[in-house]
């Protein structure tokens, strides 16, 4: 029973490891396996997760969000502020970290002001903000980080590729915030304590992690410096890293590497990608989620602009299209009981609506 509970709580890494194991039956382990793993991507992801965990422990992100929300006095403006801070947070952190940080804050604000009836839509819009708003920077989500390193995309070109879908996504998200009524509310005055000295030190470490991603310093140097600093300053941050995400990533490297060596699979994806990498990437993401879709499809195409856009807008749609969406679902069901069906219906309506608009618009834009 305990094993089943553990597997249920860690479903994604378990599924990823099982998928890798199945492909290993068709491609037995050999020396080529060593070439599957992008050590730089794994190192950068680890450093970002560790530093962000340290910053969250120091109380910085909840404090910034609370002060932003306190400047607004209606349900619509408060929810918009929460959604915007999630969007901005996803660009600086990772999408899952932004949700882990700001979804609890939203519940605190909505419950404290008697506006829990807006929890479902607020959480869904924050989910869209995290998954779609974070597409603008290379280090905001795992698929961007991987593709940025895999194709060695120049910084300026990355921004040029992702700016149009980012602007459209932001406009759609802000438009949906208008669905929240302008009811007057009083935001709770309680403020999260913050350790200013630690925030400054961790801010320097975050800049170091960003420099690693942007190729400003060698990744091994940043990895050594950040790990050593946190071992001294905050070992809990290292323990708090989402190790399941790192295991998932490593397993999907194995999965995609093996799939790329199975000839019928190679033939199938080459035929599919001949019809356009972007729609194939977006639709593949609906089934296996956008991180493994990015890793898998990168083995079969050099059209990285279309693949990059496809896996990012493919984060909208099904609940599994982005792993971060499972965080939103888990957080909602933890706080709100008996409304799961309503939440899933609203989630599907909003998320598939976003996917349809973005896919149509970007297909036209990238012709």
Model-derived segments and their meaning:
Residues 2, 66, 179-203, 235-239:
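Flexible interhelical linker loops that connect adjacent transmembrane helices
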Residues 2-32, 44-59, 179-182, 208-236, ...:
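Structural signal for alpha-helical transmembrane segments and their membrane-water exit/capping regions
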Residues 114-182, 188-191, 328-358:
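Membrane-core helix-loop-helix motifs of multi-pass transport proteins
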Residues 39-41, 70-83, 112-123, 197-200, ...:
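Membrane-interfacial loop-to-helix junctions in multi-pass transporters
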Residues 82-84, 88-132, 295-309, 337-341, ...:
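Hydrophobic transmembrane alpha-helices that form the pore/transport pathway of multi-pass ion
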Residues 3-9, 31-41, 153-165, 191-196, ...:
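Interfacial loop-to-helix junctions that mark the boundaries of transmembrane helices
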Residues 159-170, 279-367:
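C-terminal transmembrane helix pair
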Residues 36, 58, 62-67, 205-302:
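Transmembrane helical segments that form the transport core of multi-pass membrane transport proteins
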